[in-house]
């Protein structure tokens, strides 16, 4: 900011009737109807500086602004300065904050060496567009891209040749374009250089309510002894440019940041490895080292998680082993239910075989067989059960036992009574696949019973009045008694075999 080349329009002291030679501005415009090829203006050194010729009638005149103690007296007379009242209401320049103005005033001071060497090197040229009433010439002389000034000229009509402006403050953002052009040694070279102006640096200044300046550069600051000649655009073209340039500058900055971040990734990974494994406790000045140190606490929880997972797996294996062990023991110790075994033809259920064992029945049967005693209570119970079974469809009407009338043969009668009143025989008759029930039902010796009696010993009651139905008259003997006795012996053998099989199943199940 302190170099001699950095000069711009002063801010707060700029007015129409300023007497300070270092701060006054003169505005000279070329006539629109001029037929001359060039307009020559005297420079402070005495040489005439030509401007670009305005030969096209469609284009507006070009305005040249000379600054900073170049001319002792203005080229425009006092009469020309006094215009209509409307000229005083025109929009003015946008200026910078006070520090930037002070530095610019110091540079513009004639005592400054840079200003004495090149007093006329700073010039501002505003080219207006055709048909637009608002002209926005802007200038930037700051090298560090921190301060810039924008000027707004609003002549009333295209025919008016001179316009005087007043300063105005605004909060809008301004884009400043600065160029570097050599001081022309001759007149033709200056005109060619003005036509071939190249943009060197773009500076975007944001002005807020506190007159704070924030600048963003799209390129690095360049220093040199070259004079800066800024070509200022009009307001209409100026309003269209900031959005594109803002996006380009932001895109450039974001692209640069991405490239730098991508380039730093492998370097940061190497640094992280070196810091984590080589120098875990030391501090590093690099940002990558800080990132690596910041990543150190993350490794601790992962190791803890892995250590926690191992006991979980061990505990699960132990619990599974215990579960399998208990399951195997439970299989060995748990008694099997009788319902789980498939039904076997000719074999009664184990739970019921205990109640109807043949061991206590044999002495009773033998006792009844040899003594000839018969129990009236059992006979009455048998007859009552036969009378109550009306729902049994398989009961034969002629299946009632026909006993012989001769009472001299008690063994035959006792055998018939044992088979008719025994629980074992009634259960064997209930099984559909039992061969015993099929043989007995074909011969018609025993009556079929669907519901077994609970106990063999029944309470003694009065005999039924219809007990004499079993004794049929007209029969003198029992020719089938020997056959029945053989069948009884065969059935007992079969029952004993079935009972042994049932006992084996019970022992295996327990």
From Swiss-Prot:
Keyword line: Phosphoprotein
InterPro entries, alphabetized: DUF4641
Residue(s) carrying Phosphoserine: 43, 84, 120
Biased composition (Basic and acidic residues): 78-92, 379-395
Residue numbers spanned by region Disordered: 1-154, 208-227, 234-276, 368-480
Listed Pfam families: DUF4641
Keyword 4Fe-4S in record: no
Biased composition (Low complexity): 139-151, 243-255
Keyword Transferase (UniProt): no
Polar residues bias: start-end ranges: 50-60, 97-109, 118-135, 414-441
Name by which UniProt lists this protein: Uncharacterized protein CXorf49 homolog
Species the sequence originates in: Rattus norvegicus (Rat)
């Amino acid at each position: 900011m302190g170099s001699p080349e950095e000069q711009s329009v002063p801010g707060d002291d700029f007015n129409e009737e300023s007497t300070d030679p270092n701060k006054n501005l003169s505005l000279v415009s070329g006539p629109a109807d001029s037929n001359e090829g060039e307009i020559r203006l005297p420079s402070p050194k005495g040489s005439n500086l030509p401007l670009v010729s305005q030969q096209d009638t469609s284009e507006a005149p070009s305005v040249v602004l000379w600054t900073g103690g170049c001319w002792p007296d203005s080229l425009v007379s006092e009469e020309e300065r006094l215009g209509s009242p409307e000229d005083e209401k025109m929009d003015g320049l946008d200026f910078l904050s006070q520090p930037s103005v002070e530095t610019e005033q110091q540079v513009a001071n004639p005592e400054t060496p840079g200003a004495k060497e090149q007093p006329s090197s700073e010039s501002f040229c505003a080219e207006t567009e055709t048909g637009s009433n608002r002209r926005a010439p802007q200038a930037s002389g700051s090298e560090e891209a921190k301060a810039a000034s924008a000027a707004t000229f609003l002549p009333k009509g295209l025919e008016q040749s001179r316009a005087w402006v007043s300063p105005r403050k605004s909060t809008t953002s301004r884009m400043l374009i600065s160029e570097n052009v050599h001081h022309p040694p001759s007149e033709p070279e200056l005109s060619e250089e003005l036509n071939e102006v190249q943009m060197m640096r773009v500076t975007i200044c944001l002005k807020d309510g506190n007159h704070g300046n924030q600048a963003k550069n799209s390129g690095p600051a360049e220093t040199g002894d070259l004079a800066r000649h800024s070509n200022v655009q009009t307001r209409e073209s100026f309003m269209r440019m900031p959005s594109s340039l803002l996006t380009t500058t932001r895109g450039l900055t974001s692209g640069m940041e991405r490239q730098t971040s991508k380039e730093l990734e492998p370097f940061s990974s190497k640094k992280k490895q070196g810091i984590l494994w080589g120098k875990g406790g030391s501090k590093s000045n690099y940002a990558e080292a800080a990132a690596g140190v910041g990543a150190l606490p993350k490794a601790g929880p992962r190791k803890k998680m892995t250590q926690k997972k191992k006991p979980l797996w061990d505990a699960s294996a132990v619990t599974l082993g215990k579960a399998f062990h208990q399951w195997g023991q439970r299989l060995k110790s748990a008694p099997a239910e009788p319902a789980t075994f498939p039904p076997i033809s000719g074999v009664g259920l184990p739970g019921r075989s205990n109640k109807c064992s043949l061991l206590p029945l044999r002495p009773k049967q033998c006792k009844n067989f040899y003594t000839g005693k018969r129990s009236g209570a059992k006979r009455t119970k048998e007859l009552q059960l036969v009378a109550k079974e009306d729902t049994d469809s398989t009961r034969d009407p002629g299946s009632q036992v026909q006993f012989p009338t001769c009472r001299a043969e008690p063994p035959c009668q006792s055998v018939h009574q044992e088979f008719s009143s025994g629980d074992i025989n009634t259960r064997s008759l209930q099984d559909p696949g039992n061969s015993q029930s099929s043989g007995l039902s074909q011969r018609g010796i025993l009556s079929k019973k669907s519901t077994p009696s609970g106990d063999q010993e029944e309470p003694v009651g009065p005999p039924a009045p219809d007990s004499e139905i079993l004794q049929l008259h007209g029969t003198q003997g029992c020719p089938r008694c020997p056959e029945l006795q053989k069948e009884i012996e065969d059935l007992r053998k079969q029952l004993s075999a079935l009972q042994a099989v049932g006992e084996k199943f019970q022992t295996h199940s327990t």
